[in-house]
């Protein structure tokens, strides 16, 4: 992290150990975010599972340091629009990194509207 800071440029440093090694206990000394879960899958049961696991460590997050339940699956086609809305809201309420995981060149207008929801982004 110190080497990245010396560049003088803002850099978001994300750690990924797939939720192992109790990364939520030490991640904020090294990075800005750390994965608390296994890879998310493009299905509702995976979204809920990752949210519940991520929610076990709220004390680890703070300004400039976030628990990361993995990227957003909004726009990838495996969720209904209601599930996509819920997925985005859960990540926003959890203060999770809102990392878009779909192809923005092909995403539907409805899914893009979810990703651009200013109210949820403001909560996040």
Where are these regions (language model features)?
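Alpha-helical scaffolding within the catalytic cores
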Residues: 1-3
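Glycan-recognition surfaces
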Residues: 5, 9-103
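Glycan-recognition and catalytic regions of carbohydrate-active enzymes
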Residues: 68, 99-124
């Amino acid at each position: 992290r110190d080497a990245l800071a010396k560049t003088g440029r803002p850099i978001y440093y994300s750690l990924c150990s797939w939720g192992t090694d109790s990364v939520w206990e030490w991640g904020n000394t090294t990075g800005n975010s750390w994965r608390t879960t296994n890879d998310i899958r493009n299905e509702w049961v995976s979204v809920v599972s990752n949210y519940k696991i991520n929610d076990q460590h709220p004390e680890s997050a703070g300004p400039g340091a976030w628990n990361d339940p993995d990227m957003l699956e909004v726009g990838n086609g495996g969720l209904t629009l209601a599930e996509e809305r819920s997925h985005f809201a859960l990540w926003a309420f959890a203060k999770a990194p809102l990392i878009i995981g779909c192809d923005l060149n092909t995403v539907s207008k409805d899914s893009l509207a979810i990703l651009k929801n200013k109210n949820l982004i403001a909560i996040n």
